[in-house]
């Protein structure tokens, strides 16, 4: 991306978290190097970004989920971690450690199937997932945070999108040490 000398339209697809928190940094570096090059940033979930890159509708993608395809050059880019969280008023907010029994009792507000965040959550909850109560799936991180703030249930999102909410005390971070919520972010 940054080593290109040609100045032409660059069409980038990014997942929601990446677009909101990381893409602009990379885009600004490209704009410094290729002054005057027009850029389009479109937001999709991981599956959609992969499909659009494969169909040549996008020049590159920035994704949160795993992708495997022989026609794609998939480059690990950054590390990320999901955080479980709840309203400060939720009974789990006062618990130092969350165990599987707590995870099964909770009502969950999650990203939709096909998103990288949901992919990581589903992997982390292996063995529990069929028994979990997921009454609400939403496409946007802000909508999930607002629903959790209203104490409708608990959520799971990237630490990148929760940092400020934790700092203001609007959401409480939950610790479930037996669940691996780490993930890689990729360029394709």
PLM regions with names:
Residues 12-16, 107-113, 175:
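Short beta-strand->loop
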């Amino acid at each position: 991306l940054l080593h290109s000398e040609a100045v032409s339209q660059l069409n980038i697809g990014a997942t929601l978290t990446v677009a909101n928190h990381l893409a602009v940094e990379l885009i600004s570096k490209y704009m410094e190097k290729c002054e005057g090059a027009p850029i389009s940033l479109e937001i999709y979930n991981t599956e959609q970004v992969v499909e659009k890159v494969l169909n040549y509708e996008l020049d590159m993608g920035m994704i949160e989920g795993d992708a495997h395809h022989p026609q794609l050059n998939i480059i690990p880019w950054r590390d990320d971690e999901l955080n479980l969280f709840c309203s400060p008023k939720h009974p789990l907010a006062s618990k130092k450690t969350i165990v599987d029994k707590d995870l099964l009792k909770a009502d969950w507000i999650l990203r939709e199937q096909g998103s990288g965040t949901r992919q990581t959550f589903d992997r982390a909850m292996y063995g529990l997932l069929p028994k979990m109560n997921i009454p609400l799936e939403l496409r946007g991180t802000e909508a999930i945070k607002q629903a959790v703030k209203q104490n409708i249930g608990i959520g799971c999102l990237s630490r990148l999108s929760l940092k400020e909410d934790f700092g203001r005390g609007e959401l409480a971070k939950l610790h479930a040490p037996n669940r691996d919520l780490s993930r890689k972010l990729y360029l394709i």
